[in-house]
Amino acid sequence: DGKIKNEYKQADFIKLSVKKLNELGLRDKTKTKLTVPEIRSGGSLNVKNIEFKFNGIDEGLFFKNISFEMGKIYGIVGKNGKGKSTLLRCLVGCERKSKDEIYLDGKRLSKADRIKISSLVMQDVNHQLFTDSVIGEVGLGIKNAEIDYVEDILKKLDLYELKDCHPMSLSGGQKQRVVIASILCKDSKLLFFDEPTSGMDFYNMMNISNLINECKTNNNIIFIVSHDQEFLNSIADYIIYL
């Protein structure tokens, strides 16, 4: 039922301001420069050591003595193949080949310990859809008393009208928002997002940004891998460059 509301010649479209583009649900045409400060030490998640070697080569990930503060959002950026997604898996505890020593509030956490307190949104969200309805997926493990909160999240992500649909029947962007919604409803100490805004327009990108910010508390830490500099500028407290 879509309809054409405006038509622009190329020369006129190029002249549109960022504000006007955003009003149309479009992104900034220019390359955004990250303006948040780099990571600094101090916090309650302490990475004493992470070692991970890629198959067949000596290159890999090597981190020592890095601290992350509770109540902060960390953006992770770098070129393709630098190990951004691998770093997330190492921190979560689901990368079996990694050697690590990680502490939370002074207590050493095993891989199994970290998995229990972590939530992860992967790039391919098809691996994270398990139920036969959107509301069932987002509310999985949520008490009935909190169903109003689940429905509120669905409304904010334009998913409420799809709440009875099977998740696998949705578009790629809708599936992505379903998984993000399910993660935001969980009370995890460590939240990990791998390219959560890929392919999203400005409107949905800002919805995701606002919701993640709302979920930031003094009792959790959020890590976001993204090539979306506009998104990271809107949300990240610190940036990790790989």
Language model segments and positions:
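Conserved ABC ATPase "signature" region
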Residues: I147-L162
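Conserved ABC ATPase signature
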Residues: H166-L170, Q174
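Catalytic Walker B motif of ABC-type/P-loop ATPase nucleotide-binding domains
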Residues: L191-D194
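H-loop/switch region of ABC-family ATPase nucleotide-binding domains
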Residues: S226-H227
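Helix-to-loop junction immediately C-terminal to a conserved catalytic motif
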Residues: V92
